[in-house]
Regions:
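Short acidic, glycine/proline-enriched helix-loop-strand junctions
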Residues: 70-88, 133, 148-150, 270-275, ...
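Acidic-and-aromatic substrate-binding clefts and catalytic sites of carbohydrate-active enzymes
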Residues: 38-44, 60-72, 90-98, 121-125, ...
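Bacterial Sec-dependent N-terminal signal peptides
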Residues: 1-25
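N-terminal pre-domain/capping segments
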Residues: 20-113
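Histidine-acidic metal/acid-base catalytic patches
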Residues: 21-35, 42-54, 167-170, 174-186, ...
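Conserved beta-strand positions in the central sheet of alpha/beta enzyme cores
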Residues: 62, 87-89, 115, 153, ...
Length: 282
């Protein structure tokens, strides 16, 4: 009898623990925001746009532009509103030719990361291009880390998923760059649209991804390898083709800390609140 009671108590405890796990939200934090989402608004008035974002509950920013202002001025605007810039996006040209200026601006913004989202190229991305990029990334990442204490991240844009060996040139970029100096930001839409599974990509390189762009692809939009798609194909999270919960579970397991909504659609002002409500409901 005593053993039966103990067994029942253990079963009950397990059921309670399982229910508690299920009731915990998958994404309890407020997501960050990529400034590119509100690029037209930022170009007109940085302070007013920050007010709009703060009213939505956004505090974590990834700036992709200084919008005619300066890094110290934007930092002050952020501080005044209880907001912060965790990542600073720059062009490949600036990374490779103005690295010290990039580091100074990133430091002034208070950013922990510097990010490049696109490698200029004509035609298909090639192994020779990838080899040059690896060299440049290692060089820039080393300087940013050693002189500024900042981590460099590369944001995939899809064209890197050209087949190479047993994988792709994205695998080559990840495997050939020095993990001490180069990390990555996974854009889940640009991974998915090129036939990749973001979950498997994170599983393959769980320690290399530090940042994540939250996006969804319109149902019916076709996959392609061009590195581009119509901006109207960006839709509110949870209404498109991507398995957002599965991606978030794997990203959390990998320890990714910063998640930024990026919505390139003209309907971003309507879709961003929808995306945030969706994340709260997970």
């Amino acid at each position: 009898m005593k053993n039966r009671i103990i067994l029942l108590l253990l079963i009950l405890a397990g059921a309670i623990a399982t229910q508690a796990q299920r009731s915990q939200p998958l994404f309890p934090q407020t997501p960050g925001m990529v400034s590119f989402t509100y690029r037209n608004s930022f170009a007109k008035d940085v302070a007013a746009t920050l007010d709009t974002l703060k009213a939505l509950g956004i505090t974590d920013m990834e700036f992709s532009n200084l919008f005619g202002s300066t890094a110290p001025a934007i930092r002050q605007m952020l501080d005044d509103r209880g907001m912060f810039c965790s990542s600073f996006g720059v062009s490949y040209a600036d990374l490779t030719t103005k690295i010290s200026e990039v580091g100074v601006n990133a430091k002034a913004l208070g950013a922990q990361y510097v990010r490049v989202a696109y490698i200029p190229h004509e035609g298909p991305f090639t192994l020779d291009m990838a080899k040059k990029v690896v060299e440049e990334f290692n060089k820039a990442g080393k300087l940013l880390k050693e002189e500024f204490g900042i981590t460099y991240c590369y944001h995939n844009h899809g064209y890197e998923f050209v087949p190479y060996g047993g994988g792709t040139l994205m695998d080559y970029l990840i495997e050939q760059t020095d993990p001490k100096y180069v990390s990555f930001e996974i854009d889940i839409l640009w991974s998915f649209i090129h036939g990749q599974d973001p979950v498997k990509l994170i599983q393959r390189y769980p320690t290399r991804f530090k940042l994540l762009h939250l996006k969804d692809l319109r149902k019916g939009a076709t996959l392609n390898t061009s590195g581009g798609t119509a901006v109207e194909n960006d839709v509110a999270l949870g209404t498109g083709q991507l398995d957002i919960p599965a991606i978030l579970k794997e990203a959390k397991k990998a320890g990714i800390k910063h998640y930024y909504i990026e919505d390139e659609s003209p309907a971003y002002a309507r879709q961003v609140p929808q995306s945030m409500a969706y994340l709260r409901g997970l």
